[in-house]
Amino acid sequence: HAELLEQVKEDLKKEGIDLKIVIFNDYVQPNMGLKDKSLDANFFQHVPYMDDFGKKNGFEMSAVGNIHIEPMAAYSKKIKSLNELKDGAEVLLPNDPTNLGRALIMLDKAGFIKLKDNTKLDSTVQDIVQNTKKIKFTTLAADQIAPRLGEVDAAVINANYAIDTGLTTADAILIESKDSPYANIVTVLKGNEADPKVAKLVKALQSEKIKKFIEEKYKGSVIPAF
């Protein structure tokens, strides 16, 4: 995300906007920064996560622009395809409600497990109604999964953490479909949707220049969503 913002920093300067980029290593502080008004906008989440976070923390946010999708994927150091998973194998999944549901829906759509309802975005391991291989699903914080990939049979990893550890979708044994509702968005506190600074930021991020940058740099690990 920061890389994309760096790409538009100079363009925004010409528009009279001094873009200050603040990098966080978790999924909580960027939203709390909107709430306490220390940030004008953030760029890290998708709508299901934003809605869930707002509900739990008692404030509303708005999505003001889709920028890209980071397809979630399953990886393994031990097998080359999901079908090779042995009975009772251990698979790591992210533990926050949105990404856990997202991971389970991906596994359901691949025919690997069956969920009670594969449109329910906040499905949990308890919603699995068919697990023929008796896979042991362990849930962990999203940022802790990639470092532990070697200890388990397979793991579902968010693209940003996969990229950080040098994994690409070419290494994946399963990739989420491109029509996922999980595009990364620019987010503001509800009521600030008309902020002209933010409108210019979104316009810069949805430019042809950024589209090209995403396609050339990430080669499918990240895809434009505009």
Language-model-derived ranges and their functions:
Residues 21-32, 119-147:
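Short helix-initiation/N-cap motifs at beta->coil->alpha
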Residues 52-64, 78-79, 151, 156, ...:
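Ligand-binding "clamshell"
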Residues 101-108, 205-225:
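Periplasmic-binding protein-like
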Residues 35-45, 89, 112, 133-136, ...:
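Alpha-to-beta junction loops
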Residues 71-82, 183-195:
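A bilobed periplasmic-binding-protein/Venus flytrap-type ligand-binding module shared by bacterial periplasmic
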Residues 27-58, 80, 162-166:
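Pocket-flanking alpha-helical
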Residues 1-20:
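Short, polar/charged alpha-helical segment
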Residues 64-113, 211-212:
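A conserved helix-loop-strand patch within extracytoplasmic ligand-binding domains
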